[in-house]
Amino acid sequence: MPKIEKTDAEWRAQLDENEYRVTRQKGTERAFTGKYWDTHDDGTYRCICCGAPLFRSETKFDSGCGWPSFHTPNDEKLIDEHVDQSFGMIRTEVTCHDCGAHLGHVFDDGPAPTGLRYCINSASLKLEKDGK
């Protein structure tokens, strides 16, 4: 169970329409449209809903899929995994442990050292650049 619980009205007041659709309604942004899919700045990618430090820029890589991709979470305890059988597929959904926000999915076709590809919606993230 998420540590941070808010009403639907509170989430709607905090997030813009796209952030709400992605994080609270398990939406997906179109490939190559999110603000972080091609970002190369150093920093920490935080949950847009609660600020949890989910991924570091050092683990981000270009997977060619059009979404920010990471091979390792900042702390595995901050990411929860769930079986997702929507759209006739079986995938592994990843959510923020602290607030339950839908982040994206994890696949087993990533690079070393983990072989994993955390395919994350930009709308679920906020980049805190190093030194700021």
UniProtKB/Swiss-Prot annotation:
E.C. designation(s): 1.8.4.12
Binding residues for Zn(2+): C47, C50, C96, C99
RNA-binding keyword on record: no
Any Pfam family the entry gives: SelR
Keywords: Metal-binding, Oxidoreductase, Zinc
Domain MsrB, first and last residues per copy: 8-130
Catalytic residues as annotated in Swiss-Prot or TrEMBL: C119 (nucleophile)
Catalysed reaction, written as an equation: L-methionyl-[protein] + [thioredoxin]-disulfide + H2O = L-methionyl-(R)-S-oxide-[protein] + [thioredoxin]-dithiol
Nucleus listed as a keyword: no
Cofactor note: Binds 1 zinc ion per subunit. The zinc ion is important for the structural integrity of the protein.
One of the GO biological process terms: response to oxidative stress
Cofactor: Zn(2+)
Entry's Gene Ontology molecular function annotations: peptide-methionine (R)-S-oxide reductase activity; zinc ion binding
A GO cellular-component term linked to this record: cytoplasm
Family: Belongs to the MsrB Met sulfoxide reductase family.
PANTHER family membership: METHIONINE SULFOXIDE REDUCTASE, METHIONINE-R-SULFOXIDE REDUCTASE B1
NCBIfam families on file: peptide-methionine (R)-S-oxide reductase MsrB
Name of the protein in its database record: Peptide methionine sulfoxide reductase MsrB
Gene that encodes it: msrB
